[in-house]
């Protein structure tokens, strides 16, 4: 599976901007006009916020500023918000995101009629042993039968760096039943995290971050039931140079209206010591098959 890298989409912002240190974990939707809307995590060296950007046809990306700030839902996200996942619903937009309360990340939900002004709905699900020290990086998937929620769980092992992909299901998106871990670190992996799942022809494709402790690559797995996954290995690794020379992280894959597949992700250049991630993109040029 060969991707065509398109380079850097959004660099860290200017000094004093909310993404001046890093721009991370993008989530992209395409609207009816063909415009691309992005929500992403921005960090200024102190606080995570959720930011918004747009790319209209024939234009570059334009930053739209802060979509959601720390304390949006109250005490449960008072110290920062990040890792948005946005889906279109009949009533507007639904966002799942991570909020930090000063001790641990917890999953939250918010709704919006147009995707700009959001209404907080607080936390969802109690944490378990698999995400005892943090639940983050949610991915919402609506199938014909149910809603799925995939997310990263941190159990505190390996100095807090070990992560697994967990899943939950819901008939409507209002209440969730935990299914537990569906993808664990394998072999030399320290963490499997940051899931992004697409449903194509009744098959689920999970793009996720595979962390070996030194570099992060984007890996791919497939499933027909959402619970048992077949690993297909790395689909996009660090390039060795340029904006993603050291790491390719936190993917968001999107099937566009024309049927093609694009992916936005967080890149880290070789020599970076500040974790100054920037948002990059790649395109899958051929017919889609695993």
Question: Where are the model-predicted features located?
Answer:
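Beta-rich carbohydrate-recognition and catalytic domains
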Residues: 1-79, 87-136, 141-190, 198-246, ...
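Conserved active-site neighborhood of enzyme catalytic/cofactor-binding cores
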Residues: 252
């Amino acid at each position: 599976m060969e991707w065509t890298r398109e380079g850097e989409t959004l660099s860290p912002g200017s000094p004093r901007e909310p993404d001046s240190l890093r721009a991370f974990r993008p989530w992209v939707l395409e609207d009816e006009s063909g415009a691309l809307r992005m929500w992403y995590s921005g960090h200024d060296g102190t606080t995570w916020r959720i930011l918004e950007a747009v790319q209209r046809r024939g234009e570059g990306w334009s930053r739209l500023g802060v979509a959601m700030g720390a304390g949006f839902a109250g005490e449960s996200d008072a110290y920062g918000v990040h890792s948005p996942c946005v889906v279109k619903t009949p009533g507007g937009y639904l966002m799942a995101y991570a909020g930090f309360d000063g001790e641990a990340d917890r999953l939250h939900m918010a709704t919006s009629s147009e995707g700009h002004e959001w209404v907080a709905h607080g936390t969802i699900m109690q944490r378990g042993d698999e995400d005892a020290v943090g639940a983050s990086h949610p991915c919402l998937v609506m199938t014909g039968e149910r809603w799925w929620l995939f997310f990263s769980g941190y159990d505190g092992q390996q100095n807090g760096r070990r992560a697994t992909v967990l899943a939950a299901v819901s008939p409507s998106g209002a209440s969730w039943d935990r299914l537990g871990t569906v993808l664990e670190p394998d072999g030399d992996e320290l963490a499997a995290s940051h899931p992004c799942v697409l449903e194509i022809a009744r098959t689920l494709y999970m793009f996720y971050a595979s962390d070996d402790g030194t570099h992060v690559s984007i890996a791919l797995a497939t499933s027909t039931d959402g619970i048992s996954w077949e690993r297909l290995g790395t689909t996009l690794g660090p390039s060795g140079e340029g904006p993603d020379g050291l790491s390719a992280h936190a993917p968001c894959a999107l099937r566009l209206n024309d049927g093609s597949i694009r992916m936005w992700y967080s890149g880290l250049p070789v020599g970076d010591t500040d974790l100054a991630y920037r948002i990059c993109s790649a395109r899958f040029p051929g017919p889609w098959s695993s």
